[in-house]
């Protein structure tokens, strides 16, 4: 039986940036606050962390900074995916060497690999890793979908332990869950589908929402695991307005604005990402205030 990397909520943390580079002071404060709020794991340099627009040097520095500061208090999951498989392998080896607890590896984007190509790619990365590998399926961003039968093949690899499912296709996710049961954990990759995926046997969520509400997002999962399914469902439904506001523009544009309003760095993004439209930002902040946040 493979070990589960985490149960509950893992925050896909933003990477605070400014015109000079990474704002490590704000990043450290964000990490400490997340841990103090009871988050179950932290994902670094993923989609929300703008891993695709960090330089290679920045990417490695951000990973090492997080591993060193977190110091084993919660699992650190390193975003090491790329559409260049050799680079993904190199970054995975580096993340293993500095003590990251697991890797989050997105499907190769733009290249549009076949299912056989995905099997060979993820196998090569997992073979090179000394730590657990979590697959990341987000076809709306990558143009590439990991089909259930492909997950079933990959679930046989001893280092491939889970999948972050952000396809949004509950029927597909249910089919995957049926095929990989006991061999691969499933995490929701969409904040509006946390409870539906938990009901299919999911182990939690890799979340954007938990940047803003780490304790509540974790509790949504834990309530479900305790058998308090109505509480968990109600928390999911109660959060929908905020979730929708956090995704009214492409992630991480809205959450970057939200975290800046909460004092965790500047609302600074790198092209091709641009700051949130003023009317959308005003609506987001109004909704955050409705949820009791002082922004």
Model-derived regions, located:
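A general structural signal for well-ordered alpha-helical segments in protein cores
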Residues: 6, 27, 59, 63, ...
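C-terminal alpha-helical cap/extension of soluble enzyme domains
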Residues: 8-16, 33, 37-39, 199-200, ...
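Catalytic alpha/beta core domains of metabolic enzymes, predominantly
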Residues: 127-128, 141-247
């Amino acid at each position: 039986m493979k070990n589960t990397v985490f149960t509950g909520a893992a925050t896909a943390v933003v990477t605070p940036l400014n015109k000079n580079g990474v704002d490590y002071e704000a990043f450290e404060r964000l990490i400490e606050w997340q841990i103090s709020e009871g988050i179950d794991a932290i994902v670094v340099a993923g989609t929300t962390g703008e891993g695709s627009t960090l330089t290679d040097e920045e990417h490695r520095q951000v990973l090492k900074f997080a591993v060193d500061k977190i110091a084993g208090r919660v699992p650190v999951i390193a975003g090491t995916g790329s559409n260049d498989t050799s680079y993904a392998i190199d970054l995975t080896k580096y993340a293993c060497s500095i003590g990251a607890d697991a890797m989050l590896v997105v499907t190769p984007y733009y290249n549009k690999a076949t299912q056989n190509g995905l099997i060979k790619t993820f196998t090569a990365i997992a073979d090179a890793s000394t730590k657990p590998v979590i697959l990341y399926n987000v076809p709306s961003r990558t143009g590439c979908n990991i089909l259930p039968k492909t997950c079933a093949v990959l679930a046989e690899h001893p280092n491939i332990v889970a999948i972050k499912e952000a396809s949004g296709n509950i029927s597909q996710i249910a089919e995957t869950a049926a095929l990989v049961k006991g061999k691969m954990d499933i995490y929701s990759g969409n904040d509006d589908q946390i409870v539906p995926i938990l009901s299919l046997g999911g182990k939690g969520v890799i979340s954007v929402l938990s940047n803003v509400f780490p304790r509540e997002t974790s509790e949504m999962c834990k309530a479900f695991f305790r058998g308090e399914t109505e509480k968990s469902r109600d928390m999911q439904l109660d959060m929908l307005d905020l979730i929708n506001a956090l995704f009214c523009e492409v992630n991480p544009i809205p959450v970057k604005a939200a975290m800046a309003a909460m004092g965790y760095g500047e609302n600074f993004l790198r092209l091709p990402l641009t700051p949130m439209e003023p009317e959308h930002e005003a609506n987001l902040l109004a909704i955050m205030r409705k949820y009791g946040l002082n922004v």
